[in-house]
Amino acid sequence: MQQSTNVDPQEIAKFERMAETWWDLNGEFKPLHLLNPLRLNYIDQTAGGIFGKKVLDVGCGGGILSESMARIGAVVDGLDMGEEPLEVARLHALETGVSINYVKNTAEAHREDHREYYDVVTCMEMLEHVPDPQSVIQACCDMVKPGGFVFFSTINRNIKSFVETIIGAEYLLKMLPIGTHDHNKFIKPSELMALVDNTDLLCKDALGITYNPLTGIFKYTPKVDVNYMIATQKVD
């Protein structure tokens, strides 16, 4: 059964329109392709390796992170509410020979049959696109096994993030389509930590990611003032 209460139709439609360019390395999702190796390494290293582990990728879109995790041996389920991105993800997985189970569903509905089922849950660049981030975080917590890891990434809400991710990335550098992000939906680290504290997850680490437009390279940074990730672990 699919649940649609925590879905923003405008957000779904936005990514449906861009779906066909998901795997174009120089297209609208180029930043995600550049960013993905950092995300994958952080997840794999922090979780003590994901080879052979059951992993759920919440808000998987066209499957960039899902595929990379499957390639290093994870057993991956990809979850999204966009039909077009999921079709792109399924087709690309067929073309590359990667085995991934893609499902159209919300995290809340998927939870009903998958409580404490996964070793690792990822929810990357997704929380800022849903009406109720707390609901998604709780669902992720419920689906991971005790002792398992849940990873979140989002964007801080401040003047610097507005300048870099909207004025810079969308309007000046044209790295993203205009309207991709809504600054009001960005989440401060303190706010995300408070949401996590309402669950059985404990924050184990936080790490920022910065982009150099001159070199076109993303790299880790201890500063969480714009893009950042957190690693949480479920209380055993």
Swiss-Prot record:
It is an enzyme of class 2 (transferase). The keyword Methyltransferase applies. Keywords: Methyltransferase, S-adenosyl-L-methionine, Transferase, Ubiquinone biosynthesis. One of its GO terms (molecular function) is polyprenyldihydroxybenzoate methyltransferase activity. It catalyses: a 3-demethylubiquinol + S-adenosyl-L-methionine = a ubiquinol + S-adenosyl-L-homocysteine + H(+); a 3-(all-trans-polyprenyl)benzene-1,2-diol + S-adenosyl-L-methionine = a 2-methoxy-6-(all-trans-polyprenyl)phenol + S-adenosyl-L-homocysteine + H(+). Its EC number is 2.1.1.222, 2.1.1.64. S-adenosyl-L-methionine binds at R39, G59, D80, M124. SUPFAM superfamilies: S-adenosyl-L-methionine-dependent methyltransferases. Pathway: Cofactor biosynthesis; ubiquinone biosynthesis. O-methyltransferase that catalyzes the 2 O-methylation steps in the ubiquinone biosynthetic pathway. NCBIfam families: UbiG (TIGR01983). This is Ubiquinone biosynthesis O-methyltransferase. It comes from Shewanella sp. (strain MR-4).
